[in-house]
């Protein structure tokens, strides 16, 4: 597979280097950066990406902002296709991610191994951080699905420290919150924070992220090559190494 990709990328490089622009949600930032950097080295093309929570990203798209590629949760794709924003057939599923929890580095690790244990941890926590439900997919899921299932929505909301962007683990690292919840890929590698683990399986509904070429892309062929690379065995390995599971 590596030989095949190298040959394809040499063809792309021969056609002249492109500068691709990518509009993406933050959940894929680490994995995408690693994989696209490797692709850039092999192809000679440049990739410039911006990362936002899903809500603000949708707002940018609605306002008319465009790039060569958009990466967003798959539940947004029906609307993107209906509105003629993405190129039909260009979508590539990149990976799925589950919800996890993090605490300040050095703090005791709370028990989140079962639904009852998680309820106890939430009840005992003085402050809880998760993404603003209006801005991030993980925050919306935590607020509208997980907390109601636990019967603790109002109780947790009363002591919530909502994240506006980036990683909610930054709030536990700074001491603003005692425990943080988000897609595990966004909790990883935050200085001063430690990932506790994943939430119980019965509370999970992994979010699948996918990319597609946007209509009006300046470099549609190169954009599709990048997406194909991300979905290949080489690209998939990078996503798996960064906490994703296969879509």
PLM features: residue spans?
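Sec-dependent signal peptide recognition
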Residues: 1-8
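Hydrophobic h-region of N-terminal signal peptides that target proteins for export
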Residues: 8-17
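Exported/periplasmic ABC-transporter solute-binding proteins
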Residues: 17-55, 59-63, 71-84, 90-97, ...
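Periplasmic binding protein-like
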Residues: 68
């Amino acid at each position: 597979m590596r030989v095949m990709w190298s040959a394809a990328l040499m063809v792309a490089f021969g056609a002249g280097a492109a500068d691709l622009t990518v509009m993406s949600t933050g959940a894929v930032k680490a994995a995408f950066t690693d994989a696209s950097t490797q692709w850039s080295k092999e192809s000679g093309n440049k990739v410039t990406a911006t990362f936002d929570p899903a809500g603000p990203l949708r707002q940018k798209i609605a306002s008319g902002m465009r790039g060569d590629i958009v990466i967003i949760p798959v539940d947004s794709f029906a609307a993107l296709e209906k509105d003629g924003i993405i190129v039909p057939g260009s979508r590539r599923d990149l990976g799925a991610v589950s919800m996890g929890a993090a605490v300040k580095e050095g703090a005791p690790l709370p028990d989140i191994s079962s639904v009852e244990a998680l309820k106890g941890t939430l009840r005992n926590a003085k402050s809880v951080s998760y993404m603003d439900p209006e801005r991030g997919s993980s925050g919306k899921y935590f607020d509208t699905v997980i907390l109601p299932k636990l019967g603790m929505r109002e109780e947790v909301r009363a002591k919530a420290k909502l994240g506006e962007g980036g990683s909610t683990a930054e709030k536990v690292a700074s001491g603003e919150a005692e425990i943080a919840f988000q897609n595990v890929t966004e909790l990883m590698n935050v200085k001063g924070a430690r990932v506790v683990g994943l939430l119980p399986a019965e509370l999970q509904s992994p979010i699948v992220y996918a990319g597609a070429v946007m209509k009006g892309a300046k470099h549609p062929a190169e954009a599709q090559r990048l997406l194909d690379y991300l979905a290949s065995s080489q690209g998939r390995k990078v996503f798996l190494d960064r906490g994703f599971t296969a879509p």
